[in-house]
């Protein structure tokens, strides 16, 4: 999986994308708070891993 995280100053939000080049899955999101954005990423990774099991 590849995770990209960046801050969009114009919107005042942390944005992220998560892609899996093997399965072609892609998820994305945005939050104003960095910790909430990181939590969303972690929850999404855990969800995708559990789906594959």
Model-flagged regions — what are they?
Residues 1-15, 39, 43, 47:
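Short N-terminal "domain-start" leader segments
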């Amino acid at each position: 999986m590849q995770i990209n995280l960046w801050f969009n100053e114009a919107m005042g939000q942390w944005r992220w994308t998560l892609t899996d080049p093997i399965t072609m899955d892609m998820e994305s999101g945005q939050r104003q708070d960095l910790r909430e954005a990181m939590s969303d990423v972690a929850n999404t990774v855990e969800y995708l891993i559990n789906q594959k099991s």
